[in-house]
């Protein structure tokens, strides 16, 4: 296709006998791969590149239609930008490390890690595949850490092939030569390099501190990974006693923590307890002496208004412990059970006996024992009363989190540094959020941070911290003086690799070294996706050129639910490392809801596998459903929308074939023979054709503005609305003239009028192929191949500009087409109400409309009469606004004043 001085030259191929959407995916996907249609060239400067930080989907089994939904939004923008002339950098990654992957591997192969076991090079898992069923830990075969990691790598490789096949079928215009795995060597090198630089600048640090702990997954959990869920429990009214035996009552939902109590806390303004501040009481059962203290965070209207502070029952306990410098009395282990040894602070013999009964028990079992003992001692006032409380859960867990003291790695994120917090708020203000109301979620999250980002995890399949520690003469690790590798050694696994100056024989012995065994949280790697895909800080020239042309990136598309995790953490990392935003724009997709308007998720079991609708309706139809939804808003899984999308794709094929076939008969009267065409806007001379071009110019302008603002659904709505009007009204109105068909009186349209119609049809359908290309890549590529053989893909063609359509319109109003369409609609209505064939002639008719409507209809009267088979008198009556108001007729409507039908055509005899 060439477009010089607004003339569009077309090379028309022979048209297929039958058209349809089935089979288009396989046909065009092969061509795109062979031609490198979506390959990133990287031959131009930064301004000519559009780079996308594509979300790497979590490799933990299967995708659902929610993924198809959000990734389609991104692909629409990628395709649009490519057609706008940008060299689009659109990579794909796989988030294949972390807890979701580990859990899938455990269930899929029926295994679990036992770090004490040696590596078995001949290990074969007991089975493969469990149809998503959870395998109990007691039934899982213990294997070494290395064997487990090998199984993780094997299964994720299988899953990634399936994911890629789905994305390709959906038509994502990914450059598949630009892929990465978050557990791969390059991402590991980036993650470790960034961490070492954070460490050198004092932004990463380790600390022994109380933190949230998931007893199921046996790992620490960050604030961003929390979910607050309603959890049933019981309030227990329990007596602490003064020296003289006088009781003071607290109410608690966790009596099993009585042995961990350090104090009683009340609000300093609570008149009920002011007299007791500074005094001491004894805990029930254990007889441990604890002070009564004041703290403003104590809630006067909650329970008894006075609470016990234990180490640790919840985050409030941590706050009180820290502010009031209370002792640490931990009794819960990392496995969620009570410690085996009776603590030294319990000195009372009877108290030590009670504790011994709870040792090694789960918190649930210990609670039952303690409540029974409180009844026996008389320290339980009444029976427990049921309650529901909001409790912290790990977002992927099913048990309430405990708070356990452990050594962990943290990264500064503004949670403890007011200056950094303010800087990250400012970064959020620099970022263009789409939709903009999502910005407040970012700001609320940053303002509400109460601690730095915990980035270490006590798991196995992840990026290792590139650290060792010296081991002193007593065999204890010196955590205050970590040993770091040089960057040119990265990536390293400290459990396998040896620090410089040491050898393997010195591992885990006095005077030697020991490895950091924790791994990085998966978000600690995912937060660096902009640096990973753009090859930040890599020494080779190709990587330097890639980084220069793609970073900072242009777009981060993602779900609204991970603003606090992925979006914020990526902003934090880029701010610390690159002193800038990682991208200029962020688009936030909503959730997909099931028919009951509940969020689709694998954990709820209400997901739809995307292969099903793609196979049934076609990729274009599924993309249409996804693209019709606005950013930031939830949408339902709607088969009806997919059917509309399929109908739209089929209509594009049929309408284009119909219009391109006009006037293309070879000597054997075969319709649609190969031909060349030049669609010159100057050849559009008829009023109706010019009106169609005027409307097209308006649509191109509105769609372009919407897509520039990342409003893909608004652009689709504008394009689709006019496409149907173009097909249902314009093509129907001009097809007789385009064919050169004589009217009912034998008058043949002029050559000029015929050319005007054919040119407008060509210009229009060429434009629609390009306008719909980001949404319906397969159907548009098919029709483009009929129009522009040999010119390459529609997805490398230029996005339409208004110039040729403005030139063709020469000042015409698009309203002329609207009025003409309404007039034809009334002519059809006359026949449908009379229950006669649409081919029935109208002997005479009078239509009324507002004066501007009459003027517009008159300008296209010949086309309207021929489309409606008006063979006789055709009168137009102008109505003033007052008349329309009196009759209750809208000023924008056309009405039938009088009509007379002729004889319906004779029915053809059946053979």
Curated annotation (Swiss-Prot):
Coiled coil: none annotated. Keywords: Aminoacyl-tRNA synthetase, ATP-binding, Cytoplasm, Ligase, Nucleotide-binding, Protein biosynthesis. It comes from the Bacteria. Residues 882-911 are annotated as: Disordered. It is found in: Cytoplasm. The keyword Ligase applies. A motif ('KMSKS' region) lies at residues 599-603. A motif ('HIGH' region) lies at residues 57-67. GO terms for molecular function: aminoacyl-tRNA deacylase activity; ATP binding; valine-tRNA ligase activity. GO terms for cellular component: cytosol. Pfam families: Anticodon_1, tRNA-synt_1. It catalyses: tRNA(Val) + L-valine + ATP = L-valyl-tRNA(Val) + AMP + diphosphate. Its EC number is 6.1.1.9. ATP binds at residue 602. InterPro entries: aa-tRNA-synth_I_CS (IPR001412), aa-tRNA-synth_Ia (IPR002300), Anticodon_Ia_Val (IPR033705), M/V/L/I-tRNA-synth_anticd-bd (IPR013155), Rossmann-like_a/b/a_fold (IPR014729), tRNAsynth_Ia_anticodon-bd (IPR009080), Val/Leu/Ile-tRNA-synth_edit (IPR009008), Valine-tRNA_ligase_type_2 (IPR022874). It is an enzyme of class 6 (ligase). GO terms for biological process: valyl-tRNA aminoacylation. NCBIfam families: alt_ValS (NF000540), PRK13208.1 (NF009687). Belongs to the class-I aminoacyl-tRNA synthetase family. ValS type 2 subfamily. ValRS has two distinct active sites: one for aminoacylation and one for editing. The misactivated threonine is translocated from the active site to the editing site. Catalyzes the attachment of valine to tRNA(Val). As ValRS can inadvertently accommodate and process structurally similar amino acids such as threonine, to avoid such errors, it has a 'posttransfer' editing activity that hydrolyzes mischarged Thr-tRNA(Val) in a tRNA-dependent manner. Monomer. This is Valine--tRNA ligase. The gene is valS.
């Amino acid at each position: 296709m060439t477009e010089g001085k607004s003339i569009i030259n077309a090379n028309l191929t022979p048209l297929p006998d039958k058209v349809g959407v089935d089979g288009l995916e396989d046909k065009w996907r092969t061509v795109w791969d062979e031609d490198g249609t979506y390959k990133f060239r990287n031959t131009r400067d930064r301004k000519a590149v559009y780079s996308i930080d594509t979300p790497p989907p979590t490799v933990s089994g299967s995708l659902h239609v929610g993924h198809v939904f959000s990734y389609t939004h991104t692909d629409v923008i990628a395709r649009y930008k490519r057609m706008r002339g940008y060299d689009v950098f659109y990579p794909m990654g796989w988030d294949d490390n972390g807890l979701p992957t580990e859990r899938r591997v455990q269930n899929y192969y029926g295994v679990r890690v036992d770090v004490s076991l040696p590596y078995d090079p001949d290990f074969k898992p007991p089975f493969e595949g469990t149809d998503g069923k959870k395998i109990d830990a007691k039934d899982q075969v213990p294997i070494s850490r290395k064997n487990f990691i090998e199984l993780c790598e094997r299964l994720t490789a299988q899953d990634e092939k399936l994911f890629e096949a789905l994305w390709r079928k959906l038509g994502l215009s990914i450059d598949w030569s630009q892929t990465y795995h978050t557990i791969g060597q390059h991402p590991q090198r980036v993650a470790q390099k960034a961490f070492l630089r954070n460490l050198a600048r004092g932004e990463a640090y380790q600390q022994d501190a109380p933190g949230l702990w998931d007893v199921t997954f046996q790992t620490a959990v960050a604030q961003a990974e929390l979910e607050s869920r309603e959890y049933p429990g019981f309030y227990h009214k329990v007596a602490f006693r003064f020296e003289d035996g006088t009781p003071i009552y607290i109410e608690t939902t966790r009596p099993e923590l009585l042995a961990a109590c350090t104090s009683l806390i009340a609000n300093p303004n609570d008149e009920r307890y002011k007299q007791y501040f500074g005094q001491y009481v004894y805990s029930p059962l254990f007889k441990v002496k604890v002070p009564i203290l004041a703290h403003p965070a104590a809630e006067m209207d909650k329970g008894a208004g006075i609470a016990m502070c234990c180490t640790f029952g919840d985050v409030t306990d941590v706050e009180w412990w820290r502010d009031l410098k209370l002792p640490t009395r931990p009794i819960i282990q990392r496995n969620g059970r009570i410690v085996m040894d009776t603590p030294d602070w319990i000195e009372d013999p009877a108290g030590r006996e009670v504790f011994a009964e709870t040792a090694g028990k789960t918190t649930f079992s210990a609670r039952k024992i303690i409540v029974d003992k409180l009844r026996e001692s008389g320290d339980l006032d009444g029976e427990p009363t049921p309650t529901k409380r909001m409790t912290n859960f790990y977002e992927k867990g099913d048990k309430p989190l405990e708070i356990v003291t452990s050594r962990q790695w943290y990264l500064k994120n503004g949670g403890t540094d007011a200056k950094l917090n303010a800087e990250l708020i400012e970064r959020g203000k620099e970022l263009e959020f789409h939709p903009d109301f999502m910005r407040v979620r970012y700001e609320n999250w940053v303002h509400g941070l109460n601690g730095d980002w915990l980035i270490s995890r006590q798991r196995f399949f992840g990026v290792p911290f590139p650290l060792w520690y010296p081991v002193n003469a007593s065999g204890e690790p010196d955590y205050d003086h970590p040993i770091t590798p040089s960057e040119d050694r990265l990536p390293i696994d400290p459990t396998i690799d040896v620090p410089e100056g040491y050898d393997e024989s010195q591992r885990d012995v006095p005077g030697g070294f020991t490895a950091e065994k924790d791994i990085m949280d998966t978000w600690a790697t995912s937060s660096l996706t902009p640096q990973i895909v753009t090859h930040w800080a890599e020494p080779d020239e190709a990587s330097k050129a890639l980084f220069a042309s793609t970073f900072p990136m242009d777009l981060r598309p993602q779900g609204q639910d991970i603003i606090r995790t992925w979006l914020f953490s990526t902003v934090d990392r880029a701010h610390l490392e690159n002193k800038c935003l990682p991208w200029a724009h962020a688009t936030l997709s909503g959730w997909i809801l099931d028919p009951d308007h509940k969020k689709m998720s694998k954990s709820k079991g209400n997901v739809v596998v995307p292969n099903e609708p793609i196979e049934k309706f076609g990729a274009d139809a599924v993309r249409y459903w996804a693209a019709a939804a606005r950013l930031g808003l939830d949408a339902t899984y709607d088969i009806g929308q997919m059917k509309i999308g399929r109908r739209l794709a089929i209509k594009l094929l049929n309408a284009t074939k119909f219009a391109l076939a006009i006037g293309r008969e070879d000597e054997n009267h075969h319709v649609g023979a190969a031909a060349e065409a030049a669609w010159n806007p100057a050849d559009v001379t008829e009023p109706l054709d010019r009106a169609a071009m005027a409307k097209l110019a308006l649509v191109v302008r509105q769609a372009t503005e919407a897509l520039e603002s990342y409003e893909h659904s608004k652009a689709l709505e504008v394009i689709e609305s006019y496409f149907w009007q173009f097909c249902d009204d314009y093509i129907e109105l001009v097809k007789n003239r385009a064919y050169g068909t004589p009217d009912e009186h034998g008058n043949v349209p002029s050559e000029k009028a015929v050319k005007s119609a054919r040119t407008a049809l060509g210009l229009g359908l060429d434009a629609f192929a390009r306008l719909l290309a980001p949404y319906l890549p397969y159907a548009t590529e098919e029709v483009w191949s009929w129009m522009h053989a040999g010119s390459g893909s529609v997805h490398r063609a230029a996005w339409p500009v208004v110039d040729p359509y403005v030139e063709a319109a020469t000042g015409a109003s698009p309203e002329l087409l609207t009025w003409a369409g309404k007039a034809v609609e009334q002519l059809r209505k006359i026949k449908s109400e009379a229950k006669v064939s649409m081919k029935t002639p109208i002997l005479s008719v009078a239509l009324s409309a507002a004066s501007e409507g009459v003027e517009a209809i008159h300008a296209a009267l010949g086309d309207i009469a021929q489309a409606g088979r008006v063979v006789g008198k055709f009168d137009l009556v102008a109505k003033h606004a007052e008349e329309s108001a009196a009759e209750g007729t809208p000023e924008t409507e056309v009405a039938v004043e009088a009509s007379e039908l002729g004889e319906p055509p004779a029915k053809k005899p059946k053979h």
